[in-house]
């Protein structure tokens, strides 16, 4: 979703919310939470508050009138009823015959509510310096995780990674072969953004940064001499991230045409730009997702930018066998998250079985 539309939607949801959610929103902006995260959370709050009114737990006439005491007094049984409602309500997707929403959606809803409750019971300071209330019912509600071993998840993900020489083959395909099948009209659009698209893909494959981190890069954040980029990680921390040297020519090519191609002036600080009717703007996450999906599907299999992050992490672990190094590269505080990559490249177990 484009930034302007996203902000418009956020304002629309904010206009519906009670005062304590607006305070929460303002507080999380300072962390900072991304606008995308806050938008998703506001959607979940709307769903939850509508249920409170429809179920009779709140007698408010509208969401904005819901009293904070309603949240304080919610019981574990109430929250379990809400989860049951999510599991059993008819799907809003016309093409789906499934009842209820997915477990992933339920977990996201509970995560959003946990964040709100933590703010109200621990983080906020009222006039007396104390939180608005102390009873956090969300601490009694557990989320159900998908039952899947790391080995099973690794095998599933492995099919969607560009490992070994496929990393460079993918870049070469976009640069030299993708255009062959295109119509003249499609070629015109492709040529306009070819250098930019290659630079973005190369940056993702060479650094493993998150999509949001790539989108928010400014010109000042990239040092091609040192092959380092400065990014804002989750939680707002600044971090310096190394890039593999294979990305340098793609980034140099893009930077050489950036200003003229995208009509960029001094005030246009974003690294990756789009241009519409002579006006440059920072590229948004959805545009990169569509772009990566389009090229990867034509090359081998449709993947997301996050799979390019997995690709870099797996290749780095394969080369170093160091989970610590991989976790630092990805911006993770612990090595637990990187356990997945040890399973993706675990050929020793297969070799041992072959030798039986």
From Swiss-Prot:
**Compartments, as annotated in UniProt:** Cytoplasm
- Presence of the UniProt keyword Cell cycle in the record: yes
Q: What does this protein do?
A: Site-specific tyrosine recombinase, which acts by catalyzing the cutting and rejoining of the recombining DNA molecules. Essential to convert dimers of the bacterial chromosome into monomers to permit their segregation at cell division.
- Keyword annotations of the record: Cell cycle, Cell division, Chromosome partition, Cytoplasm, DNA integration, DNA recombination, DNA-binding
Q: Name the family.
A: Belongs to the 'phage' integrase family. XerS subfamily.
Please list the GO biological process terms of this entry: cell division; chromosome segregation; DNA recombination
Q: Extract the PANTHER family matched here.
A: PHAGE INTEGRASE-RELATED, TYROSINE RECOMBINASE XERC
Which residues are in the Tyr recombinase domain? Answer: 169-354
Q: Which residues form the active site?
A: 210, 234, 306, 309, 332, 341 (o-(3'-phospho-dna)-tyrosine intermediate)
Q: What is this protein called?
A: Tyrosine recombinase XerS
User: Could you give a GO molecular-function term held by this entry?
Assistant: DNA binding
Q: Which domain of life is it from?
A: Bacteria
Which Cys pairs are S-S linked?
none
* Domain Core-binding (CB) as annotated: residue spans: 16-121
Checking InterPro entries in the record gives: CB, DNA_brk_join_enz, Integrase-like_cat_sf, Integrase_catalytic, Integrase_recombinase_N, Integrase_SAM-like_N, Recomb_XerS, Tyrosine_recombinase_XerCD
Designated gene of the protein: xerS
Entry's Gene Ontology cellular component terms? cytoplasm
Pfam family, any one: Phage_integrase
- How does its record describe regulation of its activity? FtsK is required for recombination.
């Amino acid at each position: 979703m484009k930034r302007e539309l996203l902000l418009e939607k956020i304002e629309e949801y904010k206009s519906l919310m009670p005062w304590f959610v607006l305070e929460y929103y303002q507080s999380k902006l300072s962390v900072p939470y991304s606008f995308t995260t806050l938008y998703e959370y506001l959607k979940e709050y709307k769903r939850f508050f509508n249920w409170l009114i429809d179920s009779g737990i709140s007698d408010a006439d509208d969401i904005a009138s819901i009293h904070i005491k309603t949240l304080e007094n919610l019981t574990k049984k109430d929250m379990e009823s809400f989860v049951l409602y999510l599991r059993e309500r008819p799907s809003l997707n016309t093409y789906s015959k499934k009842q209820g929403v997915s477990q992933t959606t339920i977990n996201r809803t509970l995560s959003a509510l946990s964040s709100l409750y933590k703010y109200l019971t621990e983080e906020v300071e009222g006039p007396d310096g104390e939180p608005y209330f102390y009873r956090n019912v969300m601490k009694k509600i557990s989320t159900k995780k998908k039952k899947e071993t790391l080995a099973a998840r690794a095998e599933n993900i492995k099919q969607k990674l560009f490992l070994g020489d496929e990393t460079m083959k993918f870049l070469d395909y976009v640069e030299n072969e993708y255009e062959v099948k295109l119509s003249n009209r499609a070629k015109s659009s492709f040529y306009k953004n070819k250098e930019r698209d290659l630079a973005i893909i190369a940056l993702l494959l060479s650094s493993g940064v998150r999509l949001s981190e790539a989108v928010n890069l400014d010109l000042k954040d990239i040092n091609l001499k040192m092959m380092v980029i400065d990014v804002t990680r989750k939680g707002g921390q600044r971090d310096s991230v190394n890039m593999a040297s294979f990305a340098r020519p793609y980034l140099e090519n893009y930077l050489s045409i950036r200003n003229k191609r995208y009509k960029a002036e001094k005030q246009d600080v974003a690294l990756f730009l789009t241009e519409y009717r002579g006006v440059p703007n920072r590229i948004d996450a959805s545009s990169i997702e569509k772009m990566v999906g389009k090229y990867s599907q034509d090359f081998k299999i449709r993947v997301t930018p996050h799979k390019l992050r997995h690709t870099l992490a797996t290749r780095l672990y394969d080369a170093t066998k160091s989970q610590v190094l991989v976790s630092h590269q990805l911006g993770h505080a612990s090595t637990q998250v990187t356990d997945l990559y040890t399973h993706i490249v675990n050929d020793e177990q297969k070799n041992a079985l072959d030798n039986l």
